[in-house]
Amino acid sequence: MSFSDRNDSPETPESSGTGTPVNSNRASASYITNMWTGLIRRFSSEGSFPSQADTAYDDNFNYHDGNGHNTKDGINGVFSPVRRTASPMRPPPLDPLILHGYRQGTPSSAKLLSAAVAEEIRTMVPERLRIVDDWNLIYSLEQDGASLATLYQRCRQFEGKRAGFVLVVKDLEGGVFGAYLSEYPHPAHTYFGNGECFLWRASNITPLPPPPSADTTNLNSRNTTLAPPPPSSEANTPTHSRPASPTPSEAVRFKAFPYSGLNDFCINCETGFLSVGSGGGHYGLWLDNGLEVGHSSRCETYGNEPLSDEGTKFGVIGVELWVMGV
């Protein structure tokens, strides 16, 4: 067959056109060039020192002997967990709380929430509210009168807002206790709130901590002892005046009872009462509509102890409601 005869034959898909062999040769040349360039770069950089990040990675994750076997993988030797170092980044310290809302003429005895107890409650609230350093007084029995309806009315402005609320109660014996509420108190036909809620109490005790032999096996609460403040001295005290007779110092023990998860009876409010936690026929904290009588018993929602030293039923002489995060 002559050369002209070969040109007249129909082209097949395998031999069609003359551009394919040329493009294939160019691609092959480019691939070889890139391969040699990469090898040259790799061999030229082998003599460089490893970075600190590479060294740290090798120290933490590579446990190989001279033969390349992993000696700490649990098979060829005793397993060793990865060595981790603490991050140097630390959150800034929280600013001290500032309590707003007490009137100028309110006596100190009528101020139920102290700064020390408020700081303890602060450690238990959600992180988004823990950084808030301003708490505002919504309702005070001393300043606004004994009425649950007034308390509800003052809370309506916070509807739909992601704020936190601290309920403070003082009984006839001077005990201070209460609850943290994830929603504002309002009359409702069903329970509301979530697992962020908790009950708490603060009681005066002697400065001595509990003995080391105390049984803490079934302890289901947070317990903190707050030292009493140092006695203040007057700068202009007359030299002839006699010092007051010393009185035994007192400390405050703070206990919190977080959500147990046994039920969802966190908050229940009606026009006739306000309650926090229930189950087993008992309320964790219950107040009547006149804010005169209260009940507190162990409940399933928080697994708490009775909050008042008077017993399961107590008389009320003070109520406050604080808000944060607005």
UniProtKB/Swiss-Prot annotation:
CC terms in the record's Gene Ontology section: mitochondrion; nucleus
Major site of localization recorded for this protein: mitochondrion
Alphabetically ordered keywords of this record: Mitochondrion
Membrane spanning stretches: none
GO biological process: response to oxidative stress
Entry keyword Cell inner membrane: no
Alphabetical list of InterPro entries matching this protein: TLDc_dom (IPR006571)
Subcellular location: Mitochondrion
Domain of life: Eukaryota
Compositionally biased intervals (Polar residues): 10-26, 214-226, 233-248
Pfam family, one: TLD
Region (Disordered): 1-26, 209-249
Keyword Membrane attached: no
Function: May be involved in protection from oxidative damage.
Full protein name: Oxidation resistance protein 1
Source species: Gibberella zeae (strain ATCC MYA-4620 / CBS 123657 / FGSC 9075 / NRRL 31084 / PH-1) (Wheat head blight fungus)
